[in-house]
Each structure stands twice: as structure tokens, then as C-alpha cells.
UniProtKB/Swiss-Prot annotation:
Protein name, entry field: Uncharacterized protein R09E10.5
Extracellular side: 26-1326
Cross-referenced PROSITE patterns: AMOP (PS50856), NIDO (PS51220)
Residues annotated as domain AMOP: 648-829
BP GO terms, sorted: cell-matrix adhesion
Signal peptide bounds: 1-25
TM region positions: 1327-1347
Amino acid sequence: MRRGCRHHLAAVVLLIATFPPLAYNQNIGGINQNIGGTPQNPTINQVSPGQIFSGTGNNPFYGVNLVPFGPEAGDLMVNPSMLTSGMTIDLYMFFPYYGGLYNYTTISVNGYLGFATVLDQGPTINVGPETTDWPRQEDPAMIAPYLCKQQVPQQGNPARRAGVYYRLLLRQSLFGRESNSNLNLGGTLQQNAFFGQQASQACPGTADSYVRCDSNSDYFLDQMMIWVQEGVAGGAMFRADAAVVVTWYNTASAISGRSDIDAGQTGTYQVIWLTDSTARLSYVIINYDRLGFDAQDFRGNSRSGRCRAVFNGGNHTGTVEVDPTQPYKNTPKVLAQRSGVPHMVRGRYMFRVDDVVRPAGCSNKTGGTYPIMIYPNIVNMLGDMTVDVNACCLDRTQTYIMMIEEREVATCQVINPAIARCSLPRIYDWGTKTVYFQPESRGANDEKAFVGYIYFVPPTLDPMRLDIGNIYEWYKNPMTNYLMPITWYPRNFTNPDILTNGNNMGVRISDDSMYGVQLGLYIVGYREFKDDEIKKFRPEYRTLARITTYSNQNNANYRWMPQEEVINTNQVQQWYLTDWERMHTLYTYRVGFFKLAPINPNDANGTQLLPGLVSAPISLHWLWTPENQQFATLTLNQQDRDQRIEFVKEKSREMCHDWYDEDGALWNFIRDTETNTSCPCIETQALLDLGRFMPHPRCSQMFRDITCTTVIGSKNCYMSSSNIYSSYAGNGNTFNNMDTNRFMTHYGQVCCYDESGYLMQTPYQPVIKTQREYFYNPGYPLRAYEFGTAPYMGQFEVPGLSVFHNDYMPYFLCCKFADFRCQMFYWRRPSSACQQYQPPAIGHAQGAGVFQTIDNDKFIFNQPGVFNFLYIPQSVRTPEVRIQTRLERYPNRKVDFGLLGRYISQYELVQPTNATVITGIALEATGTERVIVMTRKDTRRFRYRTNIIVGNILRYFDTIRLQRFRGVLIYVNNVERGQPEIYVVLEEAQIGVKVTESYALDIDRLPNYQESMGMLDIQISVSPQYGVRPDGDKTQETQYRQMYNLPRVSGLIRPYPDQTSGSLNEGLTLNDVNSDSYRQQIINNYLVLGTGEPGTQQNQAGTLNQNMPQDNMFTTSRDEDKQFDVFPEASMRSEPVYKTAPIFDTGSYRFVPQTGAMILQLLNTCRDLQNNPNTDLQPYQSIATLSYGLQCPDDPGQVLTECGDSVACLYDYALLNSKVLGQEEQDAWNMFTTDRALAIRQYNSCGAINIEYPEYMMKTPALSSGYLQGDVARFECYQSHWVKGDHEYKCGIVVDYNRPNEYRFEWNKGNQPWCRSRIKENYFKWLAVIAGIVGIIIVILLIFLVFWCIKRKKLQESRNYSGTAAYSNNAFQNQTYETKPSRALSVGDLSTAPRTVAMPPPRGTTATPMTLEPRGFSPVPSDVRGSQGMLGLNTSV
């Protein structure tokens, strides 16, 4: 046996000997009835040792790989008279196939289930784009297990039961007749006699007897689900509710003779078509029991046409071969020998067919390209998950690996020969990554790597993340409930011991025991910390604790039902931190996430967690506890809860201060966010600026996500659609940086708008917020962009987690958990006030060729072909941008398909009109993927109305609506069914495109339409860096283009780039409808050569369009995408949507552009015919009806009345003959014109007023804009406070009169407003009064003291002690022995004193003369004893 993916017949036989097929009753096999025996439970039994595989079972007529069929199983046989043309049966519900929905099918002996008329003229039945000329010839959709001309033998032994059998099986629950779980577990397949059932006993509402809806049908559907689960990656998610079983038994080639039939050259094969009740998923199982011929003529040679096993989408949507290998091309009979599920049975193949057919199971293809089926193909970037892979047929002795583009290698385990399970490592990236699957032998045995893709998403956007309830509840302190819900699907977990013990040979995916495992719920912390070993800051993931343990429910009831448990936030089962780390290191992890994974008994430290599911990022504050609370109990009393709340507040305050200091040490990134991506001033600008801003994926009405946590309260939030690009900001940045490239930063911008459409400002948040949970949360710039930054590995670069660590969690720490610290956060993260915002140039193409260009020209242009919609050549600062659109003639919807075969032929079903609509758009820029968005073909617009093809592969957006590719961001607004609204952003080019199919109408509410109309509207936004003025002023564009080296922007959306005049307010008139003044100029300049009708282009190639690319982006491929050209998507993008027969390109059917005068004349003529009573007397087939009836709208008078002077409405309504389309065209035109006028306006902003002291202050009005020119902001205080400072401001223009050409916008000058308490104000008043009184008293006393001092001074000056020598007093004069200078007398000259008295000296001292003070009384009498010799003054009068 050879190794690898290549298996020959011997290898398949050996595998079948090891794994015999699933048996009904005692054998697997078609009609191996074992009549009279005891039914047994079907299972995939192991072959006993020594048993020889024969391939026939115990029935000599039927093989082992067929399900029961025939009258005994309830089948009906196709009427022999209808074998060739086919017998149409009713399916009684819709089955999806290749994008269409079918409630019928046509069964033919020629080996197909058809859904349209099949052209079987000639010896060969041709289907598909390569072999049919549709629509001139039929190209029907069909499931063809063996397509070639065949017959049913009419005589002989093989003819005894030869024929085509069919039956329909429906689950009882579809008719409300189910009991219990409706799973007939352990049941048996009872034999039913068809002739014993009356039609009245069939399923309710189904009159045909081939319909079964009883316990046997339920059991059959359950068994088919097991088959799908064992062979298809992701098949466990499918629940079959209906099945169509068709069996071709003993058919022979169409012209074979009796000798061929007797030689056993007959074929027996079977198709089982499964779907669910919602018609969303559909699988086909093909069983080949015996293929005795590979062509339809004598002896099975191929002179008359080879038989094919093929799925055809119909109408040139593409084909898929059952086994596109070289052996199959040599002889299709090999299909009965090989298998896509070799572990089950030979000759069995499985496919998923609800949309473009994808092969399941394994393949023997060893070269070329074969699509891998991977489930899930949307994986969390944190890794540690498993995916199931269908690729090459597997050998258990081999080791298989899956290499991820530019990243690590995933190891894979063989589950069975068709499915491998690969364990993905952690991938520091997000977006689509190409994966390669092959044996580790690396092609030693001619194996080639199978190529597929996996989409890695950040945890914030992962649609398959672990459900832990309302995410916002995890960010509250205190949490509203300590018991939080957790939900998961048990089938997402398997027992790792079964897969790793080396003894899993007999393990089946459908076994319930495989899912019995103990699960641990772990909390993983994330931080960006300093690593001293590498000398850098890097991300770190650490398992902090295991919270609890759950038992994964593995009974059958939980196959589709989720398991619901609770998380006790007061309980921690096991910590992986030491006590010291719990009190210190734990608080360095600001954010974390849950991980649910099987318990690894060998992992004691939580460092080797097994693959599992992770949740969205959550706060870790519920793990913070004071030292006296150690999670010892399951509940907390009120005191403990209060202590924890206060502890969280205090710890949050400390962490807020730490973050404030930490962020302040980093680069001031506000200069980059505000100068390069300033927020739009109003929401309309943000809505139309598609190249630079997008709706917030978690906090906007478009995505309707419930995980918004930080900006609740805004009507809509928008964020920068890519990383902010910065430019050189050093010295000489005015001229020296003109030739420097912009570079990508890791910053992002978030702008939130209130219900009035104005920006919410962070300085006003403390003023407006009146309640703790009041929702006024403005957007703010991000140091770490939410979508991450390449290479997604370092600090600030990890998608989702870096922004929570650096921006979102500090908001909660400062604004939610701590008290009075929100201003600190907003000082570091001030919101943008649009002071540097410049509006983009906006254009729109809608309806039947109605254009509003990006430079404000308006016209209607119709011409089929592929046009250069926008082309920008590459420059030093900007990449090359290429956008092309395909315009096709819209079909005439008045054609009655019921006339097919009587009055009209096949090619006349699609008759074009003279109106062209946009059916596709292709975009790419330098270094990006090529994106193609197209409307789907008619009868294919049910589940998906559009195709989104990236890199030649069809992408789906119904699970995750935002996807990122190389240089391109794509997101859809899937509020309406069928992804009718698609947004494509070229990130570096900053050009955005909005593609809308049929105005995004809700077709379900339009009773006259079964599906959408099939036309695209395109809105484009071009950022101002290209120099296109949105107001249409082009007077100085040439000078600016030369001065600043700007690229030339041209295309169908800007047809006159060299024009020097423009218009701002001119409308659309009838003269602008397909005017000859510009039609041929646009065709010659922008039509891609080789497209459109013959003779359209009047110039030869090479004479014009020297500066325009001429390769058709819809039919060509980039070098890296050419390997996928063999996929059926190639037909979808390269083929026209409304392809017409060649006759409609010539003669009177050629396209004739309709001018405004022609439309008006047509409407007036048709209205006159409508109002002319003689017209009603004419027969229906008259010349008047033939000449005008097919051209006139149904009600021309209503067209003129409804549309009025709206030229766009008149044109669309008249040519498309649809009131809905006409009114929608009018509404879209008016709405875009109004929004565009608002969006291109230059708003002048003063910025928000920074309020430093917001306590007890209110803003009037509270939710007014408060930043635009003319705004008035008044600040008041509540009734308990008085306002201080300047409290009224106006935003206006300030002109420097010394430089009249320089001006700015700012608020009027004033002091900072603030509030003072009335009580404190009264206290200060009383203090002022008391202080005033005391001050007045003090002033009076001071005045009295001053005057008293003055008086005393004057009194002293009035005394003069100086005079004659006799009266001179020398008491204070220095004696001869003193060294100090003489002392002046203080009482003046006393020489005029009347007399002096000599005072007796103290006893024992020498008498010294003294100067006596004048006294107002008489001196002591001289006769007093002891007074002799004394001098005195007599002052008596």
C-alpha cells in the first residue's frame, strides 16, 4: 500500500476490509432486506478477523453501499413513458441547491435530477459554461451522478427490477407530529410495503404516496446525519429534516445491444439529497454500486460521448465534477471503485450543495488545486482550538501537518480516513490566512499540498466565542449577580484521551462516548509587561486560576442543544498564583478572558491548557479581594460585599494613577490622531466618509452587537477603518516632507455621536453626567488600534486585547470603578473636536446609470461594457488604485416565461432593454487583494443576493460580518436578508466603496417580487489627499496638481479631470440624459477594450487610453490567484449576469441610448395611447400593441404623475417598468443629494471647552454641540451652588487685523467657570461682614491712634528745654568720662523756666543735675525737710 493521499483500488479495498460500511438491518446496502429476519441496529461494524470482503453482501442483486429502495421501501418508479424526458415530482418543501431554491425536481433515466428543461438533442447531453451557448441553448441546473444517455433494459434477468426509483422522506416534526426528542435512538428500520399504504395515509398536505413521514423516515434521516457526520468536516452541525432518495437500477447505455446488457455492462447508483427545515444547509450523498459502462454507445467506448458525474449550477454559474482526477477522466467507471469516505464503503461521495458545491470527504487528487473543507473556518486568533479538515484520503501510519501562512505549524490527528483534526497554535494575527495540508513526508510519494484558508479573528469579534452572558455585566462594580451564566455546545469538545491513547481505530465521531470529558473553566490574564530578558515590553498570557469544573454532557439530546451552567464569581477552585502574586502581580493584569477546555491532569501550573473555547475580554476586578477574603465560601455577607466594593474602588484608584503616569511617559499620540484622522464634525460626514471611518463593530446600529462596553449612550459610534497613517513631523515639515511616504501607526480614532448627530465631547462628560450609570460616554482616541497592527505580536499590536489593556480598561478603572478620577482619564484621552477634519469627495452611481461624480457633475450614462470607474496612478505618497464596473443591459421583465415553447423560444427568455445597470465592481490597490462584488443571477438571489469574491474565492459573511484581507477591509450590513449592503475599504489608499443591491430593499415585504431586482448602486468616497475638491471647483486644480505632485484622478465617476470649471448647485436635467456631448468621450476614455457591444469603441487599441489600464479585472487574475481559476467562482465573476443571445447585439435589437427627449416622447405617446378609447378596441395582437406595448410602461400616466420633475425617477420608471424602482431611485437621489450637501460642507470648530472643576455644574443646553462656529455654551450651577467665573461662551471667528488673511476659530476669552456652595457662600458672607466690622473698628482705632500719636508728638515738640546758661540743663549731656555722643534733649530748650530745683542725690552717690518735666501743679514747698539746696519750677499763675 502506498503512502500519502494517493489510493488505488487495492488500497480502497483494504480500507473497506478494515472498515466495512454501515448496514441497514444485517447489512449496509441498498435493498439487502433480509426479509423475515430480525432487524438490527445499524452501525459501522468492525470486520471479524479472517472475514473476506466480497463487496456484495448477502444479496445477489444489490450492493452494499445503497440505502433500501424499491417498492418494499416505499419507492415509486418513474413512469416508463417519462424516462427520457424526465418525470417531475413535488418535493413539498424547498431544497437549496447552488444558490437556488427548488420545491420540485425532474428525474430522468439519463442519470440526473434536473431543475429546468434539458437539451438532449444529439448523442451527448451538454451542460455547463464550457459546452453550452446559454441562453441560446439551455443550461439547466442539475445533480447528475452519471450523466449520459441511458436506457432501462426491457427483457432478460437484469430487467426484472430495472428502473428509476424515488421517494421523499420528511421528518414528523415538520407536521407537528413529533414525540419527545424525535430521535429514534436504538430503533429499527421496519419494512414498509408500498402497496399497503393509501394516499390518504401519507403526510398531511401531501397527496402523493412516495412521501414518507413516520418513525421510519425519522430513523432514516438520523442515519443519514450519522453518515454526514462521519464523512464531512462540520457535519455534526447539520440536522436533516428532509431527504430525496433516487436510485437508478440496472440502467444501460442508450444504444447498447443485448450482448452488452448480458455482459453486465449496466449501472446502479443512487442519490440522497438532504436538507434542513430552514433550507439553509443541504448535502448530497452519491452511492455508486456498479458502473458497467463509461459511455453511451457499444461496448462502452467514448465515440458518442463520455458519461459525466457532475453538479451543474445552471445558467453558466459553474460546474463541479464529482472526482476531478486523471483516472476519472480516463474512465468514469472508477467512481464505483474509489470512495470519498473509504472507511465507510466504496463508491460513496459526499458534497455540500446549498450554495456553490463544495466536495466533502477525502479526495484522491494528487495534483492541481482541490478545495479543502475546514470546520470551523473562523477561528479565534488566541488559538488553542481544533479544526476538522477534509482533504486527501488519510493513512493512520502517516503524520499530517497543516502549515499556516507565515506562521506556525499545526499538528493533526487522523480521526478517520476522511477527517483529520488539527490543533491550532496561538496566531498573532487576524484576517484570512492560507493553509496547506499534506503528509510530513512532503511529497515523497507524489503527494501535493492541499490548499485552503482559515479566517482568524480577535476575541472581540469571534462569533464562536464562549458565551458568558451579557458582557457589560462583567464590567460593573459591584456585579449585579455573583452567579453568571455560561453556555456552550457539548459537541465542540472531545475526550483527548480517546484521540491520544493510540487506540482510536474504532472511534467514530458519532459515538456519544467521544464527548464525555471533564471541562475546566480557566481565567487567563493579559498584560503588556517589561521583559528584562529581551529588553522590551511584550504581551503575556497567564492562567491565573481555575474557577470551576463542569461535566460535558454527551447524550444525544445535546447534539444541537447547548449546555447551560453558571459561574460562581465568589468561588475559585484552584489558584495558579502564589499569595504574594495574588496581592501584587494580580493587579498588573487589567483584562483577561475565560477559557473552557478539557482538564489536563499533567498540568499543575496552568501553563499547558488543552484546546478549547475562549470568551470575549472581561475585567478582572471580581478577583480582587481584601486579605481577609480568600474565596473560601460560596456566598458573601453584606459586610464582606461592602468591603470588597471599597477595596475595588481603592485599588482602581491606585491603578488609575499608575496608568496615568505610565501613559504620560509615552509618545503624545494625540498629535497624530488629531492631525491625520480628526473626527468628522457631524454624523452624516462620518457616514459618507467610507475610506477613513466605519461603523464601530461593537458599538453601532449597523452591526447590532451587544458587547459594547465603553461608549454606551451614543446613538452611533464610528472608528477609523484602518490604522492611522502619520507623516514626517520634524524640522522643515512644510516642504521637505513632500517626497516622504506616510507610515502606519498603531493608533486609532473613535468618534461617537448623539441623537442629534453631533460629536460627544469628553470635557463635557463630567458636566452632563448626572447619574452614576447615566449613559453619556464620548468616544476617544486609542493608543492601541482595536483591529491591531502588523505583525500583531508586540506591545499595542495584539488585536482586541491591546486596546482593552491600554485604553478600555483604564476607562473603567478611572471612570467606573474609582471615584472622581474620570477627568484624569480624559486628560490622557481627549475626544476629537473635528478641528482638522477635511471632508472627502463623494460620488454615487445608482439605478439605470444615474451618476453624481465625486467632483459634483450630474448625468445619466448608459452603455454596456466594463468601464474604468476610478483610476489613480501611483505616486510617492499614494498607491495605485484601480476600480472597474460592469454595466449590462437590464432584461425586459415583461417577458412571460409561461410562453416558452409556444410563442417564444429559449433565447427569447432574456430580452434586453435599452437601460444599463451596474452588475459588478472590481477593486484593488497596490499590495492588496482583488475584491469583486457582483449581483447574483436570476433565480439565485434567495439566500445571498450578492457574491463577494476575494482572491478568486467566494467569501461568506453571514457568520462574521467584518472580515479583513490583505490591505482590504470588507464588512456587510446584514440587517436585510441576503447581504445586500457591502462596504469595501482600501486601507492605505483610504478609499471606500459602498455597494447596495436593489437599494437594500426588504424583498420579503414586497409581495410582487420573489427575489431582488438584481442591480447594484455604488457610493464611493475619495479622501482629500488626492486633491479632489468635493464642491466641484476645478479652476486651480491643474496648478495644485503640479505644485504638490498630486496624482490624476479620473474614471467614469470623474470623467472630466482636466476641466477647469465646475458646478455646485446645478441639478439633473433632461439634457443630461445620454447626451452626445459627453457619451463618446466617456466611451473612448474609460471603456475597457474588448467589452461591450461590437462597434462601440471607435478607436483602435493603442491610440487612446494610454494612461488607463485595459485589462478586464473580471476575467483576468493576479498571479497568486490563478491557481483558483479552476473553481466554479471563475464562471460567476467572468460571465455576465444578464447574458443575452448574439442576436440581440445586432440589427434592430442593438443597444440604443435613450436621451431625455426620447424618454419624454415615449411617455407622452404611451399616455396618449392609454387615454385613447380607440386603443382599447384594437385586438391584443394588433400592430399598435406590438409597436408600443412592449416598449411602454404599464401605466405611463402614473409615471409622469409619480415622478414629477425628477429626471432620475422618470428614466428608471419608464425603462425598467417598475414603480418600486422608480420611487426608490427618486428617494435615493434626494437623500444622497441632501446628505452630500451636508457632508462636503466645511464646518469650523473651536473645540470643546475644557472644564477643570465640573462639580455641581450643568451645561445649557446639555446635549448641544458645543464646539462648532456659532455655538453658545452656558454653564450654570445647581440651586445649592453659585456660579463663579465667566459662564457663557460663544464660538466665533477671530481675525488678526495685522494679517487680514489669517484667522482662527476660538471661544471668547474668559475665566474658568466653577461652582461654590451656597452654604459656603453664606459662611463667607458672614465672615466678610464680621471681618468688615472688625476691620472698621480696627481702622477707627488705628485712626485714633494715629491722631493721638500726632497729638503727643506735637505736644512734645511744643516743649522747648533749651535757653540761657543759668537755666541750661545738662543732665542728659555726656560727661567728660563717657565715650558715647551727646544725647539731644527731648523736651526742648528750658532756659526760660522760671526756676530750677536741685534734687538731692541718692544716698551714697554724687548729686547729678536733672532736667525736670514741667508739671501742672505747684512745686513742693521749700520748707520741707530735706529739700534744702533743691531747684524747682513754679508753674503757678
